[in-house]
Amino acid sequence: PIRTIMMGYLDQIDTDYDAVASELMAFESQVGQFLENPETSSMNAMRSGWLTAQSSYELTTLHRYFSELVLSEEDVLTLFQLQYQINHWPILPGYVDYVADYQDSGIVNDITVILDLESLRQEHGVFDLAEASLGFHVLEFLIWGENKDRQSERPASDYRAVSELTNIQIDNGLQLDQISN
């Protein structure tokens, strides 16, 4: 009976992580569709995909907890490092992108930071644990925005490519290729 329970649990682990992988692939596709066509409908589909993928990931929390009981100290540390990259909370929203009183804040608006995976990994927690640039909650902030009142979600228009500079940007000597697109 115990072996049957253990084997059943191992099967459940496989099932749960397969579900996470599947939901993440669907979410990645929705992100791609949104970036190709940044409209409200594609943004809503992407938001729905984030909710499904994140919920699926949260269902694996128990497996990570139990794995700590059987893994070496080194493997547990690796697991914590991965968890920090995947699902760290809380994050510092202004480190990632603009917030209400600081429209130009965040690494998204920092013209000295190249927005690619390598740079984002380097920026992740560089000065403080809350300065996350990776993971579900960073994506959540980028998708919904600050939205403190739960009624003013980030608009899809934030993701439309910039094709001309504002007068302030021109006065500051910026070039179009320096603007986040």
Annotated model-derived regions:
Residues 1-181:
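Mature extracytoplasmic or organellar-lumen-exposed domains after removal of signal/transit peptides
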